[in-house]
Structures are given as structure tokens and as C-alpha cells.
Amino acid sequence: MGQNQNKKSIFKGIKISIQLKYKSKNLFLIKKKKKITIRENVNFQNREKLNLMLCFCLIHIHVGGRSPSIQNSFFFFFFFFFFFFF
């Protein structure tokens, strides 16, 4: 029971941090003005995909334990993180 609640709080923390990242990113884009519409639309479309990918990576790490899958999940995490945010 305790483990299950712990997982939920981890996911909640990730969602909050993602939302904060999006807000700060959009404020930064508003200052630039020219590239707003394209980048902002892409960000909002991909928000749910990124959430799902982060959850997938966390589950992957949990299931994998100390096997090589940890490295794979970190690779996926960083790949998608940089793909969506930069």
C-alpha cells in the first residue's frame, strides 16, 4: 500500500514540474514574440505525450531494478525531454 502511494506522489510531482516548465517556457517565448505561435502550439500538443513518456520511463526504472533497462529509460527520458522542450 505504501509503495503505491509513493508512486502516485512521484507522478504528481512530475506533472507539477512539467506545468511549471511550460509556463516559464511560454513566458520566455512571449518576450521573443516572433516565434510564439509555432513553438507554443507544439508545446501544448506535446504536453500529454511528454507526461506519458515520463510515466513510462519511471515504470521502466521501477520494473527494471538494477538491469540495463535503467540506462535505456534514462536515454528515452532525455531524448524526449530535449526533443519536446528545445
Curated annotation (Swiss-Prot):
Kindly report the protein's main subcellular placement as a broad class. membrane
| Residue spans crossing the bilayer | 63-85
Recorded topology in the membrane: Single-pass membrane protein
List the source organism: Dictyostelium discoideum (Social amoeba)
* An annotated GO cellular component: membrane
Name the chain's protein: Putative uncharacterized transmembrane protein DDB_G0284159
| Keywords from the named record | Membrane, Transmembrane, Transmembrane helix
Name where it's found. Membrane
